[in-house]
């Protein structure tokens, strides 16, 4: 195949006005940081008297790498406790490098903090499940995340928090 006649997405984000279709491509995805703590092992690995309480935190960060390329990092942390005693703590920073072309500027933030994390979430979820299982616990299967709700919540809470998610 020939590369003639293609712009490889380097024309910037203005193409949407020219009738070109918006494009979102995952260039790569990777673990930036992974931490697992099992502070009370091996005592915490036996049968528990009660179900652990699991607190899950989710955040999305965006970093502009070029005119069309963005790193989107999905940060997920989970802590399991029984009677205020830590069972495990897992933190994952999982990112993808995305190429976004022909998306109007007013829609760019929503694409980056909703659609991009939605595409990499299943991979991050599997890593968390495998990590907790390898730590001696049942796999932690996080429910699907409502990234639209997270986006709306961030905009309602404070304009400063919403500005932090905008590509820089």
UniProtKB/Swiss-Prot annotation:
GO cellular component: cytoplasm
Family: Belongs to the SecB family.
Keyword Phosphoprotein appears in the UniProt entry: no
Alphabetically ordered keywords of this record: Chaperone, Cytoplasm, Protein transport, Translocation, Transport
Places the protein is found: Cytoplasm
Subunit structure: Homotetramer, a dimer of dimers. One homotetramer interacts with 1 SecA dimer.
Ranges of Polar residues composition bias in the record: 1-10
Protein's name in the database: Protein-export protein SecB
GO biological process: protein folding; protein tetramerization; protein transport
Matches recorded under InterPro entries: SecB, SecB-like_sf
GO terms for MF: unfolded protein binding
Main location: cytoplasm
PANTHER family assigned to the protein according to its UniProt record, in alphabetical order: PROTEIN-EXPORT PROTEIN SECB (PTHR36918:SF1), PTHR36918
Described function: One of the proteins required for the normal export of preproteins out of the cell cytoplasm. It is a molecular chaperone that binds to a subset of precursor proteins, maintaining them in a translocation-competent state. It also specifically binds to its receptor SecA.
Provenance organism: Parvibaculum lavamentivorans (strain DS-1 / DSM 13023 / NCIMB 13966)
Region entry Disordered, spans: 1-22
Record keyword Ribosomal protein present: no
């Amino acid at each position: 195949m020939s590369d003639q006649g293609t712009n490889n997405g380097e024309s910037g984000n203005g193409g949407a006005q020219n009738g070109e279709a918006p494009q979102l491509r995952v260039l790569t995805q990777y673990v930036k940081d992974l931490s697992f703590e099992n502070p009370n092992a091996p005592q915490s690995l036996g049968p528990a008297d009660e179900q652990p309480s699991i607190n899950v935190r989710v955040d999305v960060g965006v970093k502009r790498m070029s005119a069309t390329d963005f790193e989107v990092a999905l940060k997920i942390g989970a802590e399991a406790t029984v009677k205020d005693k830590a069972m495990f703590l897992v933190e994952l920073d999982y990112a993808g490098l995305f190429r976004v072309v022909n998306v109007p500027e007013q829609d760019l933030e929503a694409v980056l903090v909703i659609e991009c994390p939605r595409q990499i979430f299943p991979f991050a979820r599997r890593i968390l499940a495998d990590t907790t299982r390898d730590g001696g616990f049942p796999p932690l299967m996080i429910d699907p995340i409502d990234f639209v709700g997270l986006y709306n919540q961030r905009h309602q809470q404070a304009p400063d928090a919403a500005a932090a998610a905008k590509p820089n």
